[in-house]
């Protein structure tokens, strides 16, 4: 059994989804922070659990050719990224391997298409930054401490400039966070502890950054806050932005769920609609539809009837406006719990939260008996659990398509098609 502060020389066998190296010491698993496959390292044990331990690198004795110097001064502290110490190939291979091993672990036979990663920097069209002592940043790993930084390679340059400007202008106020979205314009929303007048800030902001098309504000004293629970007040503009994706225009309000990586999202949506293959006269359900993205794309490309269901009322209001703006009439949208949907359907798209489908949702799918289920997931583990829960009635009929939707982080998305067993 290894002990804290003991030093070992090890060879790294693989890299896990969190960007850490994996090795064994006398058959005991050790995760080594920021180590790469094939590297020979001197390590120090930092934490010991019953079945595994964590270690830090003391020295790299043999370095991987795929190692890169992180282009971020706060990488070792910030909890945002996991793969800045490697090239993008290592990350893509690791994420592809993680998805494959998850299906294998769950004893689901599948084939896999090569992971899709069209862009790996400056892709984030949405950020929530937290205020520290003098500036904004992301949370430190495993804590709520703020790691301040002026630049982030995942963000648009304008986000970095606006966050620095905001930190300077609102210093001394009750500022606690800054929420920004980029689409046809930029939405900026400072979040405070107390009600705050930002008229002067708003005027200077829009003068210096003409791309800012709308400014909102919110305040809350809650220790942990979620955007969907905040009450937003529009200070300038109309309170929303528009994004064009897959040929359609979508309204995005502050609470709207919308993928942060447009380039990759478009490729995922195109594949999902291809697998859905909506036919004339069919009834299609887009469950967990959010602002209606995939359902409206499907409706715009077919003569099927599409039902969009989402539990968040504000998202359905946006979805209805999106349908109207894109002149899509073969769609019905309703704010409700997806597990209570009861209309006859031929096929459906499901894009559940990270925890996967509830038992009620699984029961609903088995009761509705759609011929095809296109499943989009941000969590391979829960995707596999749900596939197994449906396996008495449905079989995997497509390869597993994997998307690096959040490059440099530990997250990955997948999409599959399940077909009803005759």
Language model regions located:
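Short, acidic/hydrophobic/Gly-rich beta-strand patch recurrent on exposed beta strands
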Residues: 21-26, 137-141, 319
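Terminal RNA-binding accessory module
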Residues: 1-70, 74, 334, 338
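Rossmann-like S-adenosyl-L-methionine
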Residues: 2-9, 14-17, 196-422
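Internal alpha/beta scaffold segment
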Residues: 146-177, 181-186, 193-216
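Nucleotide donor/acceptor-binding cores
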Residues: 125, 186, 281-282
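Short, solvent-exposed loop/turn elements at beta->coil junctions and helix N-caps
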Residues: 113-120, 178-180, 400-405
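Extended interfacial segments that mediate partner engagement and assembly in macromolecular machines
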Residues: 58-70, 77-175
């Amino acid at each position: 059994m290894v002990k804290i502060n003991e030093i070992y020389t090890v060879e790294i066998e693989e890299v896990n989804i969190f960007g850490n190296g994996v090795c064994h010491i006398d058959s005991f698993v050790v995760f080594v922070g920021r180590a790469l496959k094939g590297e020979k390292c001197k390590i120090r044990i930092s934490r010991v659990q019953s079945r595994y331990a964590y270690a830090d690198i003391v020295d790299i004795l043999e370095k991987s050719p795929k190692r890169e110097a992180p282009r971020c001064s706060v990488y070792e502290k910030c909890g945002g990224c996991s793969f800045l110490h490697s090239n993008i190939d290592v990350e893509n291979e690791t994420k592809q391997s993680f998805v494959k091993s998850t299906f294998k672990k769950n004893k689901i036979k599948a084939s896999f298409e090569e992971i899709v990663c069209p862009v790996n920097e400056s892709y984030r069209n949405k950020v929530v930054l937290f205020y520290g002592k003098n500036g904004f940043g992301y949370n430190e790993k495993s804590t709520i401490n703020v790691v301040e930084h002026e630049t982030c390679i995942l963000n648009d340059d304008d986000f970095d400039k606006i966050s620095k400007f905001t930190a300077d202008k609102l210093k001394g106020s009750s500022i606690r966070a800054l929420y920004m979205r980029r689409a046809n314009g930029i939405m900026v929303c400072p979040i405070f502890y107390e009600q705050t007048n930002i008229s002067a800030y708003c005027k200077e902001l829009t003068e210096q950054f003409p791309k800012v098309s709308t400014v909102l504000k919110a305040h809350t004293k809650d220790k942990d806050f979620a955007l969907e629970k905040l009450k937003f007040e529009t200070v300038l503009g109309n309170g929303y932005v528009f994004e064009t994706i897959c040929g359609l225009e979508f309204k995005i309000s502050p609470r709207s769920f919308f993928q942060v990586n447009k380039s990759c999202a478009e490729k995922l949506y195109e594949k999902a609609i291809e697998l859905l293959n909506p036919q004339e006269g069919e009834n299609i359900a887009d469950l967990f539809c959010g602002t209606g993205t995939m359902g409206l794309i499907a409706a715009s490309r077919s003569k099927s009837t599409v039902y969009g269901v989402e539990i968040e009322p504000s998202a359905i209001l946006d979805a209805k406006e999106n349908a109207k703006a894109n002149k899509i009439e073969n769609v019905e949208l309703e704010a409700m719990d997806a597990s209570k949907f009861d209309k006859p359907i031929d096929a459906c798209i499901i894009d559940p939260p990270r925890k996967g489908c509830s038992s009620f949702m699984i029961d609903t799918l088995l009761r509705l008996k759609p011929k095809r289920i296109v499943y989009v997931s941000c969590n391979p583990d829960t995707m596999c659990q749900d596939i197994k829960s449906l396996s008495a009635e449905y079989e995997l009929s497509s390869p597993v398509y994997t998307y690096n939707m959040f490059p440099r982080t530990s997250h990955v998305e997948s999409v599959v098609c399940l077909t009803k067993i005759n």
